[in-house]
Every structure is written in structure tokens, then in C-alpha cells.
Curated annotation (Swiss-Prot):
Lineage: Bacteria, Bacillati, Bacillota, Bacilli, Bacillales
Record flagged with keyword Glycoprotein: no
Family, similarity comment: Belongs to the RibF family.
UniProt gene name: ribCF
GO biological process: FAD biosynthetic process; FMN biosynthetic process; riboflavin biosynthetic process; riboflavin metabolic process
Listed EC numbers: 2.7.1.26, 2.7.7.2
Protein name as catalogued: Bifunctional riboflavin kinase/FMN adenylyltransferase
Record pathway: Cofactor biosynthesis; FAD biosynthesis; FAD from FMN: step 1/1; Cofactor biosynthesis; FMN biosynthesis; FMN from riboflavin (ATP route): step 1/1
A molecular function GO annotation: riboflavin kinase activity
Cysteine-cysteine disulfides: none
Length: 314
């Protein structure tokens, strides 16, 4: 897959004479709803003998449009989004730098300067996709703005267990620790990536050595607590239990940490890139009166983790 970065206003150098089918969306999470849009675009592209493209933005529009300075947390930072698009068979991913100037485009100007200029023959997007200044352009109006220059397919609302499949619902589920719900809407286990760093090394003194992970700051982090996870490092996947918290049993002013006790694992992996797939929330972070209580709880957490994955893989 080719990734092309566009800056408004795009120049003729950035245009392309390759006709294509284009899926529109921000696509954070590349969840089942997004996948339905992209699969529809791919199907049409296959029928027409065209390439499949997506048009997305960076950063999230709310970063630019908000009156207060804010940092948006993503389900899939741009690199992850590109990786998932490639796996879905997308040929080209256009990434438009979202700026104040770009946000001022009228719906007609967006259509003319981006969709038509990029030689789009057919546009596919979800029913609630909007475009142009303040999102004034709706999918029901797109054929009017196209004026016969391209075709339009609108993908209906996608649901799972009666929930609308949306990035908003997935973010809510993750921040509430509802990983099973989030993963059902995503169509895959929620995943964060980071680097293994040195920690306080307390875990090894109580029989539970952990890998401390410095997670990319762009990721949305689940709520505090202990989780069943799968941990991937050096091309191998292992079962584990992850703790997100402040180590309050030992000290009250600790920084937030993400630590993973990797089951049946005994290697040094400092400095390695790692991936955490989040499966199940077990319990909130607890403060224990002594180390003995903590060890007893960790032993139970390990039993729960093994039981969870044994049941999952039955």
C-alpha cells in the first residue's frame, strides 16, 4: 500500500491520473463499521478494475477545531491505521493534514479540490459521514455536489449486539474497562504498542517479575486495573496479566505505569518493541496493607488469567 500525505491546498503535483474508488472516513480503530465501508469500496473497485483508496485526516479534527488545547487519544494512531488498511487490501491511503484552512472548505470545494482532483470514479462512505465546513456536507447531498462526475454508495449503520459500531462507543467501552464489548465492535482485540523499559523491579522480589511498557502517548489507555492480555515481543505471543496503575501499595505519588507479568516467560527484553492485546478486565487497582496480601491477590489474578484463556481457546 502506498501512503500519500496531502497538504491544503493540494497542488497539481499531488494529483493523480489513476482512476479509483475511494472510501471516506477518519477510520479511528478501523472497526467493523469501517471495514464494511472499505470492503464495499474494494468490491466496487474489483468490478470496475480500479484501485481502492481511502481518504483520512491527521490529526483528529477536534484537535484543530476545539477552543481549548487538547490531546486526542486514538484507538489506532496513524501508523497502526495504515497497517490495518494495508491488510484490508487498500492500494492508496491519502492522509490530509487537517488544518484550520482545510476546515473552512465548503462541501462543494472539498468535492472539487479533493475527490474530483484525485480522479475518484466512485465514493463509498458511511451514512453519517460529513464533510466541508462544520460538517455541513452530508452523504445524502454528495451526488448533488458530484454533479455526475463520480458515483456514490452510502453504507448503512452497522450494529453489533444492538450497539451502533462507532469509534465513540468503542472509546467509551475501553475507558470503562468493557474490553469484551470494545473488541466485539472492533472485530479484533484492542491493541497498544510500546517499548519495554526499566522499572522499580519490585515484581521480581515477590515472584512476579513484570515488563514495564512505555506506551506510545497517542493511544487511548484502558481504565486503571488488572487485565488478561496477550503480549507479543520478538515475533512471539505470550499470555499475560497487565496492571495499569500507580503502585499505590508501595507509594502514593508514583507515576502511572503499565506493567505486564508474562506467564511462563523468563527472558530479558529491555528495549524491545512490544504489543499488548487487551482481552478482559478483572479488577480495579487495590491498595494492600502488606506484601503478603498483594502476593495472594496476584496469585489469584494469575489463576484467573489462565482460566480465562483456557476457556477462550476451548
Amino acid at each position: 500500500m502506498k501512503t500519500i500525505y496531502l497538504h491544503h491546498p493540494i497542488t497539481t503535483d499531488e494529483w493523480t491520473d489513476i482512476n479509483k474508488v475511494m472510501a471516506l472516513g477518519f477510520f479511528d480503530g478501523v472497526h467493523l463499521g469501517h471495514q464494511a465501508v472499505i470492503k464495499q469500496a474494494k468490491q466496487i473497485a474489483g468490478q470496475k478494475g480500479l484501485q481502492t483508496a481511502v481518504l483520512t485526516f491527521d490529526p483528529h479534527p477536534s484537535v484543530v477545531l476545539s477552543n481549548i488545547r487538547k490531546q486526542v487519544k486514538y484507538l489506532t494512531p496513524l501508523e497502526d491505521k495504515a497497517e490495518k488498511m494495508a491488510k484490508l487490501g487498500v492500494d492508496i491511503m491519502y492522509v490530509v493534514r487537517f488544518t484550520t484552512q482545510f476546515s473552512e472548505l465548503s462541501p462543494q470545494a472539498f468535492v472539487d479540490n479533493y475527490l474530483v482532483a484525485l480522479h475518484v470514479e466512485h465514493v463509498v462512505a458511511g451514512f453519517d459521514y460529513s464533510y466541508g465546513k462544520k460538517g455541513e456536507g452530508k452523504m445524502t447531498d454528495l451526488a448533488k455536489y458530484a454533479d455526475g462526475r463520480f458515483e456514490v454508495t452510502i453504507v448503512d449503520k452497522q450494529t453489533a449486539a444492538s450497539d451502533k459500531i462507532s469509534s465513540t462507543n468503542i472509546r467509551r467501552a475501553i475507558t470503562e474497562g468493557e474490553l469484551e464489548e470494545a473488541n466485539q465492535l472492533l472485530g479484533y482485540p484492542y491493541t497498544t504498542k510500546g517499548t519495554v523499559i526499566h522499572g522499580d523491579k519490585r515484581g521480581r522480589t515477590i515472584g512476579f517479575p513484570t515488563a514495564n511498557i512505555r506506551v506510545n502517548e497517542d493511544y487511548l489507555i484502558p481504565k486503571l486495573g488488572v487485565y488478561a492480555v496477550k503480549f507479543r515481543v520478538n515475533g512471539e505471543t505470550h499470555l499475560g496479566m497487565a496492571s495499569i496503575g500507580y503502585n499505590i501499595t508501595f507509594k502514593d505519588d508514583q507515576a502511572l505505569s503499565i506493567e505486564v507479568y508474562i506467564l511462563d516467560f523468563h527472558r530479558e527484553i529491555y528495549g524491545e518493541e512490544a504489543e499488548i492485546k487487551w482481552y478482559q478486565f478483572f479488577r480495579p487497582e487495590l491498595k494492600f496493607n502488606g506484601v503478603e496480601g498483594l502476593i495472594a491477590q496476584l496469585e489469584k489474578d494469575e489463576q484467573d488469567t489462565r482460566a480465562f484463556f483456557a476457556k477462550l481457546e476451548d
